[in-house]
Design a protein with these regions (language model features):
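Short beta-strand segments at enzyme active-site cores
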Residues: 42-45, 130
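Active-site neighborhoods of divalent-metal-dependent phosphate/nucleic-acid chemistry enzymes
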Residues: 2, 84-127, 131
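Short acidic, glycine/proline-enriched helix-loop-strand junctions
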Residues: 77-93, 98, 105, 136-155
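Short, well-structured N-terminal submotif of metal-dependent ribonuclease cores
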Residues: 1-43, 60-70, 138, 151, ...
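Alpha-helix/helix-capping structural signal
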Residues: 11-12, 46, 115, 134
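Acidic, PIN/NYN-like endoribonuclease modules and their adjacent C-terminal/linker elements
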Residues: 1-5, 114-155
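Helix-adjacent hinge/juxtasegments
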Residues: 54-87
Length: 155
């Protein structure tokens, strides 16, 4: 069987660790498929930084934030242990970001989603797991689906 390659958005990673989220179960299920090697997980270095920011923010984590050491440990063990492919930008990524920014009239903080999209477009990916499908559906070449949609496709 051909292992599906899933690129993860940061929101899915966060929900996988936030048991209070209504999105936790499906996000955690998708993450478990990576650890059981049923799918290949792909993330960007940007996801790691964004994940750290949220995990250490008490407002975002509803009073249950992690210390810097706890967040760094979780990230090291979960995402930097070799299970996930981590994608890094290069000069062609920046070119693609600028191209998309102009063609899609991207402004302000939306540039960060555009940067992630550019990284995904440069990666061999079957699906992009996100709960922000609407932010990405207009970008040709991406296949953004929610974790429940991906889980249904895989079953």
């Amino acid at each position: 069987m051909n292992q599906k390659k899933i690129f993860f958005d940061t929101n899915v990673l966060i929900y996988a660790h936030d048991r209070s989220s209504t999105f936790h179960t499906d996000s955690a299920s998708l993450l478990k498929l990576v650890f059981s090697r049923q799918i290949k997980g792909i993330i960007a270095e940007q996801n790691i930084i964004e994940l750290y920011r949220v995990l250490t923010n008490s407002v975002a984590m509803k009073g249950k934030s992690l210390t810097p050491l706890q967040a760094t440990d979780l990230i090291a063990k979960t995402y930097r242990s070799g299970i996930f492919n981590i994608v890094y930008p290069d000069s062609s990524t920046i070119d693609k970001v600028m191209e998309l920014a102009v063609s899609k009239s991207i402004v302000s903080a939306k540039i960060f989603d555009t940067r992630l999209a550019a990284l995904i477009l440069g990666t061999d990916t079957d699906y992009f797991a996100t709960y922000n499908v609407k932010h990405f559906k207009e970008i040709e070449g991406l296949n953004p689906l929610t974790p429940p949609q991906i889980l249904a496709t895989l079953s």
